[in-house]
Amino acid sequence: RTLENSRMLSSDVSAGYDPLYASAFEKKNASYLGMGVVFNKFTGSRGKSGSNDANAEYMGFIRRVMESNNVTYQTAELGKVDLGGGGTIAYIMALYGMNVIDCGVAVLSMHAPWEVTSKADIYEAKRCYVAFLNADDETI
């Protein structure tokens, strides 16, 4: 019952749009450096297996928390279907009924020897986590 009545931000990074590898992304659904903390509503691969899909009510809660605290954020998908990646722990917590969504910063060249993130995104991620931890049902 405790987990069913809990909310979680699964802190993880998101692959930022890379114009050199544009074929790996859906440009209109990708995360971009310098555009704020990223929320990935759906994570996983191959459809529903080992995946998590945050419900609309939880997305609404997240948006209200971010907007009431002036946190810059973006929503994104992890990349084109079945190109690999996307495994997080969000689905494990969702199995117990917890409201969970992946949240973090966009990373260019993820898992390469040289990764790049935006300092502004890191700052917004910190602000996002503080706002989330201070949120409750009465203030939202």
What are these regions (language model features)?
Residues 1-9:
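A glycine-rich helix N-cap at a beta->alpha junction
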Residues 14, 18-21, 25-114, 136:
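Active-site-adjacent substrate-binding region
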Residues 105-140:
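His/Asp/Glu-rich mid-to-C-terminal helical/loop segments that flank catalytic regions of hydrolases
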